[in-house]
Amino acid sequence: MMPADHSPSAPSWRRVEIALIGTARRLRYAFDHRLAELDLNLNQASLLAFVNDFGGTNQTELAELVGVGRASCGAMIDQLEARGLVTRNPDPHDRRVWLVGITDEGSALVQRFYAVDECFRQEIRHGISREERQQLAALLERLGTNVDAILQTPNPQEKSSVSGRSE
């Protein structure tokens, strides 16, 4: 592990964080821009791909996989169902649950999505060496570990707001 660079020429953490968050936001926007030719956004394409790859899945599982709330997922399923891309079928093991399946038209659209996805990924990787990719992956994994640790600890501000006073 390399020692932290605290020299004046090292970028500030604020600059790094702004770059990371801004890049993630632009990446999402660019992906949605590319998927517009399929009349999909990234969440819809992801949902279709999960259903295509894993078969009948319920709305709760799909919401978790896509990273959206159940209500948002339900609205997406409604939109995709109206377009004839997915179906809702009763779960044979639990009559309260509906499983989302994919139609032939939906499966064909997923194949087009995979082609757009592969092309897009090649474009964003342009000019980044293997060594740079390894460094980036290691740093992002370390940041992810730090974020996971934060999520496992109580928020100190929540404690003070619950009691009505700060400590």
Regions found by a protein language model. Name each.
Residues I21, A49-D53, Y114, E141:
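Short, locally clustered residues in the helix-turn-helix/winged-helix DNA-binding domain
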Residues A63:
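The alpha-helix within a helix-turn-helix
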Residues G69-S72:
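Helix-turn-helix DNA-binding motif, specifically the short coil turn and the N-cap/start of the second
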Residues M1-L38, S166-E167:
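N-terminal leader segment of winged-helix/HTH proteins
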Residues R28, D78-E141, T145:
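Charged, amphipathic alpha-helical coiled-coil/dimerization segments
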Residues M1-A10, R130-E167:
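C-terminal regulatory/oligomerization modules of transcriptional regulators
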Residues R14-I18, L38-A49, G74:
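Short alpha-helical elements of helix-turn-helix
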Residues F54-N58:
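Short capping segments at the starts of secondary-structure elements
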